[in-house]
Amino acid sequence: MRIIVLIYLAVTCLAKAQKPETTFTIDAGEVVGENTEFWKAAGSDHLFYHVTRPSGQSLLDRMEATKSHKFLRTHHTFVQDKKKGVLRGQNVYSEDKNGNPVYDFSNVNKVFSEYVKRGLKPVVEYDYLPQQLENKTNEGSDGNDEGMKMKNMGPNNWKRWSDLMKAATQNFIDVFGEEEVRTWYFEVWNEPDGWPMDQLDVFYKMYDVFVDAVTSINDEFRVGGPACYHEYFLRPFLNHVVNGTNHVNGGKGTRIDFISYHIYGLSGKWLNSEPHILPQVQRFSQSILWLKRLMNDFPDLKGTEFHINEWGMSSNFYRTVEDHPDLVYRNNIESPLFLVKLVNSLYQIEDKYNFPISMLLYWGFCGEADANEVFIGKRELTISGNIPKPIQTGFEMLAQLKEKRIQVLRQKKDSRFGVLATKSGNGEMALIAYNYNETDIGVENKEKVTLQFTGLEPNSTYHVKQTKLDQNNNNTYSAWEKAGSPKFLSKAEIAKLKGVTYLDSRQKEDFVTDNKG
């Protein structure tokens, strides 16, 4: 007996309708590509703080158990600061009384060990400048226009900066082994968009020195960047790595194994102001297509991995629904719908334009799990009591997809409904169907959808298991609302909400194919 797993997100009626307005035909015999699971990634400004706390341990355990994530990324690998009362990072560099460097990677190793023992992989950022290496001149800048706070400047001693990165890289080999570290990714900075435009060459030198430092320890380690969010920054950076003069060896260009970029549905600074802006998947699709057009200008980079290693419906991690009611979409079913629709759209771009995204990294972790109140509207994956928000449930649903993507044909062009279909080598299939139009706030669409299958095994029995994420199923936020939206949860209420997210298949049925499959 073959198994078909059907996962529905806000599909109110998915059946064999007499006069369906939307029909999808799934051809099980037509493989269109690999399911690369590029979305299995998350991050936060505060991982070095949260990972070793009970809330972080709980989420890491859940990620391992559900296979919802593979990569984790965070800032402040080299320095520590405090934002909104929460520590970020650690100080790994100091100098003794004689001015000699002293390294302490103990906390970094401790945090990364928590990843590795669960099969998770770090995206390592070598940032920011330790205080002893800061340039004391007035050159450089502070932060960027999205609220990041860092010193955008070159070090006062380039050799010591290089030696720090070499020491960190060698430390990872000593602790985790070369084979493991070869599966990681390395960057030198985060969102350098605030770098003074007349000093971009200093950042290019930062990148060149970083690449030399990491690859001099092991040439197989993967290096890239620049983790920016403005195209006006990305283009000259790519021109440097392709055509510029390398600041280390004087040659042409600099190695880059992956290109990283950030996209959000809207800036957090635009919330609660006119004009009213809603995050839309189309914004991401258009940005990716513009990036594809940009990459055409650099044929030498063809085939280089492209990472969106920060994304979210809205930027800004500390704003809440109390002050910004629009952020309810960070709590409710819109977040997983947005995620699934975005994943499907990026696969469509890969198939149509031959521009695959190798990583899509959601910026959120467990920052709400340490709060007393629940569903406060931050961009996290869990809330108080380590209860998963619907966005985490969306990741867990995507994790049920199989290895090969199969063809899906639709009767008409439509941006509301979509189906992502996959199969495994043994013939099992898993499909996700969604119903989501970003501009229809609170509108429940009643249009029926039909799924037609071809290419199945003739005269065979298929067992269908159905899982739903909607207002009544597997939805912690709607369950919380039905319980009266209590600000604080009792142990019994926590246990009840956790029980909502076990993704049980409540509807099961069998069907037999005809002699044509």
Predicted regions and their residues:
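Flexible, active-site-proximal loop/turn residues at the rims of small-molecule/cofactor binding pockets
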Residues: 48, 78, 192, 265, ...
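Flexible glycine/acidic-rich beta-alpha junction loops that bind and position SAM and/or redox cofactors
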Residues: 131-134, 269, 314-318, 367-371
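Non-catalytic accessory regions flanking glycosidase/transglycosidase catalytic cores in CAZymes
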Residues: 4-6, 15-185, 201-231, 250, ...
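Noncatalytic carbohydrate-binding groove/subsite architecture in carbohydrate-active enzymes
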Residues: 199-356
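Active-site rim elements
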Residues: 329-333, 377-386
